Amino acid sequence: MNLTDTVATILAILALTAGTGVFVAAEFSLTALDRSTVEANARGGTSRDRFIQRAHHRLSFQLSGAQLGISITTLATGYLTEPLVAELPHPGLVAVGMSDRVADGLITFFALVIVTSLSMVFGELVPKYLAVARPLRTARSVVAGQVLFSLLLTPAIRLTNGAANWIVRRLGIEPAEELRSARTPQELVSLVRSSARSGALDDATAWLMRRSLQFGALTAEELMTPRSKIVALQTDDTIADLVAAAAASGFSRFPVVEGDLDATVGIVHVKQVFEVPPGDRAHTLLTTVAEPVAVVPSTLDGDAVMAQVRASALQTAMVVDEYGGTAGMVTLEDLIEEIVGDVRDEHDDATPDVVAAGNGWRVSGLLRIDEVASATGYRAPDGPYETIGGLVLRELGHIPVAGETVELTALDQDGLPDDSMRWLATVIQMDGRRIDLLELIKMGGHADPGSGRGR
């Protein structure tokens, strides 16, 4: 091989490496682009953007074309490298006593390492990183060439696609021609968290979006006000009794029951007081103004609960358990607070549900386990309970009195028991048989000998 042939071969290898880079860049830029971004740019962009749109609509075909192009250019690079390596001189190695066979092998090895490394770096890694970092800009530069190549080799691409699809079907899997663009709520939550960490979303927006996306995974049982916290009025109560109950409790909505909450006949709102003249309020029964009550099962998901509550007359629904008994009541305010946080008015208790206290937190016993995790970092194991108060009751095994403590098992980020971290719960206040307030303290390792279960 003369000098001219050697130079031509080297230039051809460089050109093939660049071709590999074009196909790699096209593949990664097309997969990195979101469909909504592609469509938006195509509507108001240049002809290149519309070219990208057409390629994105046939993404599976274009990716197969890119793979075929990468294979062809890589094989051609290897084919041209072999004679070039064979012509490399090795008299220096022979002069130091190395045999021709060993010298040929050594030179071939190092030459292939150099060529392969250059091809990998400049033909694959650099284009890939550029495409991932700047997908739209990269696609505008390379997709036209990629589409033209795929058009010219359409028969070969369809043949290889058909063979691959046949094999995949034999494995019991139906091939997907395009990448899935829809995302589940869990995937969207992960994207929101990543965007917040990178600074693309501010913390407040990310927090609101996460809670909105996670809302549908909650159930009516998790969203409701529990039965023990409901103030009910009887069917023989009057409008005057409604006024007194609203003043005493600070609530605005009350179920009207016949005996107990399992026999709820309607819902009244304090605003209905103004529909009755003052002189008639003492003898006007609540049943005359009560609205029909909506009923939802405790297992209904948050989105469905929202729809039913919004459709009800007073934006309130009673929640029933699997046995048909009333488990609680859910209002539109409950649902909104689950998304935006506490919405307090002049009638609400000013005490927040979680308060930092010394080296721990004072939390309401009615807080759900996931709310405790968000506020304090304590991750509880799964169990037959919904609230932190329920967890403590289960661990104690009896109805406690104020001052009792119990050591709680914690989970790590992978959901496995974390023996290196323990938490101590102390009952601060009881409300009848319900834990109203408790204190959580994070402790390294096991609790000290002075603490224990049910002390």
From Swiss-Prot:
<keyword id="KW-0129">CBS domain</keyword>
<feature type="transmembrane region" description="Helical">
    <location>
        <begin position="68"/>
        <end position="88"/>
    </location>
</feature>
<feature type="domain" description="CNNM transmembrane">
    <location>
        <begin position="2"/>
        <end position="205"/>
    </location>
</feature>
<comment type="similarity">
    <text>Belongs to the UPF0053 family.</text>
</comment>
<dbReference type="Pfam" id="PF00571">
    <property type="entry name" value="CBS"/>
</dbReference>
<keyword id="KW-1003">Cell membrane</keyword>
<dbReference type="Pfam" id="PF03471">
    <property type="entry name" value="CorC_HlyC"/>
</dbReference>
<keyword id="KW-1133">Transmembrane helix</keyword>
<dbReference type="GO" id="GO:0005886">
    <property type="term" value="C:plasma membrane"/>
</dbReference>
<protein>
    <recommendedName>
        <fullName>UPF0053 protein Rv1842c</fullName>
    </recommendedName>
</protein>
<dbReference type="InterPro" id="IPR002550">
    <property type="entry name" value="CNNM"/>
</dbReference>
<feature type="transmembrane region" description="Helical">
    <location>
        <begin position="106"/>
        <end position="126"/>
    </location>
</feature>
<keyword id="KW-0812">Transmembrane</keyword>
<dbReference type="Pfam" id="PF01595">
    <property type="entry name" value="CNNM"/>
</dbReference>
<dbReference type="GO" id="GO:0050660">
    <property type="term" value="F:flavin adenine dinucleotide binding"/>
</dbReference>
<feature type="domain" description="CBS 2">
    <location>
        <begin position="286"/>
        <end position="346"/>
    </location>
</feature>
<feature type="transmembrane region" description="Helical">
    <location>
        <begin position="148"/>
        <end position="168"/>
    </location>
</feature>
<dbReference type="InterPro" id="IPR044751">
    <property type="entry name" value="Ion_transp-like_CBS"/>
</dbReference>
<dbReference type="InterPro" id="IPR016169">
    <property type="entry name" value="FAD-bd_PCMH_sub2"/>
</dbReference>
<dbReference type="InterPro" id="IPR000644">
    <property type="entry name" value="CBS_dom"/>
</dbReference>
<dbReference type="InterPro" id="IPR005170">
    <property type="entry name" value="Transptr-assoc_dom"/>
</dbReference>
<feature type="transmembrane region" description="Helical">
    <location>
        <begin position="6"/>
        <end position="26"/>
    </location>
</feature>
<keyword id="KW-0472">Membrane</keyword>
<feature type="domain" description="CBS 1">
    <location>
        <begin position="224"/>
        <end position="285"/>
    </location>
</feature>
<dbReference type="InterPro" id="IPR036318">
    <property type="entry name" value="FAD-bd_PCMH-like_sf"/>
</dbReference>
<dbReference type="InterPro" id="IPR051676">
    <property type="entry name" value="UPF0053_domain"/>
</dbReference>
<dbReference type="InterPro" id="IPR046342">
    <property type="entry name" value="CBS_dom_sf"/>
</dbReference>
<keyword id="KW-0677">Repeat</keyword>
